Swiss-Prot record:
E.C. number(s) listed in UniProt: 3.1.1.61, 3.5.1.44
PANTHER family: PROTEIN-GLUTAMATE METHYLESTERASE/PROTEIN-GLUTAMINE GLUTAMINASE (PTHR42872), PROTEIN-GLUTAMATE METHYLESTERASE_PROTEIN-GLUTAMINE GLUTAMINASE 1 (PTHR42872:SF3)
GO cellular component: cytoplasm
Catalytic reaction list: [protein]-L-glutamate 5-O-methyl ester + H2O = L-glutamyl-[protein] + methanol + H(+); L-glutaminyl-[protein] + H2O = L-glutamyl-[protein] + NH4(+)
Domain comment quoted from the record: Contains a C-terminal catalytic domain, and an N-terminal region which modulates catalytic activity.
Top EC group: hydrolase
Record's comment on post-translational modification: Phosphorylated by CheA. Phosphorylation of the N-terminal regulatory domain activates the methylesterase activity.
Stated name of the protein: Protein-glutamate methylesterase/protein-glutamine glutaminase 2
Claim: Cytoplasm is one of the keywords in the record: yes
Family in the record: Belongs to the CheB family.
HAMAP family found in the cross-reference section: CheB_chemtxs
């Protein structure tokens, strides 16, 4: 059974190009085209695609507004196409907040070294996102009880509500309901309603927290970091696969939403408690020195690395500096980046957690770590912040 795809773009050339690439994969099939967001919303209701590719800037209704409307009427995995500009970065992050799951640069030459690689990447992204459709549309209980809010809980925007809905939907079997904005609030409440085991601190001592992620990472990182207190006791290093022009905008957004400080990492930064350092896109981020005075090195890293930034590079250097004092996490993402770095951390005695399959947008990086027997705990996204705070005694 093929994956049904709706292509949305006001450029006839781009619609044709994307459609040709998608249809070249026998597992995928373009079932419709829309020239603006309003038309896309109507076609979603009519065709019920498995995945949507969406432009951002369009007449009549832009892509961000269309994403919000689609999440109200029929939640569907959406892959955004955007320009690699600062404005494009902000718009893309807005689209992810609205409910889109992933994005790619609109100029294919910006994401791959050759044409075949770009084609394969687009086909793979569409196929991976299709796997989340069943979770986004799974019926939910309509009248859950609501548990008291934690003192560390933070406001949850549309994207985070959707992420919680993915996990809850995968775990419940109830009567079908029509997906409306009210239903999506109910989805989030259902997470709190489910009895959950209490966490216990391991008793280990840490000096650094490290997180690596890719596809689905912007929402996942926002979900976790916005729930950490301003007096978080350790520095945090973040590695998110993201283009160079996006990381500054993403760090600024996280900083505005979080109690901790978040910044795009710079060469020579001294790691400070309560500050999260996001690896800049197109570079490698390494740690050097000693705990308490460790610094960041930002390097080009050469063309041999598949990922820039690369989780393995950052985690490996963290293991050498901090030995057994790192609390590390591998979150949602395609591929296996982070596995070898996490292996080094575990060998040095540090802690490695992984995101569970049900709450991942793409269960690739966490799966690689879990299958290798490296992670000690596999957690749903909505419980990571709680687990962290218990572990560090906050």
């Amino acid at each position: 059974m093929t994956v049904k795809v709706l292509v949305v773009d006001d450029s006839s050339f781009f619609r044709r190009r994307v459609s040709e690439i998608i249809n070249a994969d026998p597992r995928l099939e373009v079932i419709g085209n829309a020239v603006n967001g309003k038309e896309a919303v109507e076609l979603v209701k009519k065709l019920q695609p498995d995945v949507i590719t969406m432009d951002i800037e369009m007449p009549v209704m832009d892509g961000i507004t269309a994403v919000r409307e689609i999440m109200k009427v029929l939640p569907t995995p959406i892959l955004m196409f955007s320009s690699l500009t600062q404005e494009g970065a902000k718009a893309t992050l807005d689209a992810l907040d609205a409910g889109a799951l992933d994005f790619l640069p609109k100029k294919f030459e910006d994401i791959a070294r050759n044409r075949d690689e770009a084609i394969s990447l687009l086909q793979k992204r569409v196929g991976e996102l299709a796997r989340k459709r069943m979770f986004m549309r799974r019926p939910l209980r309509t009248t859950p009880a609501v548990a008291p809010a934690s003192r560390y809980s933070a406001p949850v925007n549309a994207a985070l509500t959707r992420e919680a809905a993915l996990t809850t939907a995968a775990r419940t079997t109830a009567a079908r309901v029509t997906p409306t904005s009210t239903t999506r609030q109910t989805m989030h409440s259902a997470v709190a309603a489910k009895p959950m085991a209490r966490f216990k601190a391991s008793g280990k001592k840490y000096q650094l927290m490290a997180i690596g992620t890719s596809t689905g990472g912007p929402v996942a990182l926002q979900k976790i970091l916005t729930q950490l207190p301003a007096n978080f006791p350790y520095p945090i290093v973040l590695v998110q696969h993201m283009p160079a022009t996006f990381t500054a905008a993403f760090a600024a957004r996280l900083n505005n939403l979080s109690k901790i400080s978040v910044k795009e990492a710079e060469d020579g930064d001294t790691l400070r408690a309560g500050v999260a350092y996001l690896a800049p896109g197109g570079k490698q981020m390494m740690l050097e020195g000693r705990p308490g005075s460790a610094r960041l090195r930002i390097l080009d890293g050469g063309d041999r690395m598949n990922y820039k930034p690369c989780v393995d590079v950052t985690f490996g250097s963290a293991a050498k500096v901090y030995n057994d004092k790192v609390l590390s996490m591998i979150l949602t993402g395609m591929g296996a980046d982070g596995r070898e770095g996490a292996r080094m951390l575990k060998t040095h005695g540090s802690t490695v957690w992984a995101q569970d399959e049900e709450s991942c947008v793409v269960y690739g990086m966490p799966q690689a770590v879990a299958k290798a027997g490296i992670s000690t705990e596999d957690l749903p996204l909505e419980r990571f912040a709680e687990r962290i705070l218990v572990e560090v005694g906050r």
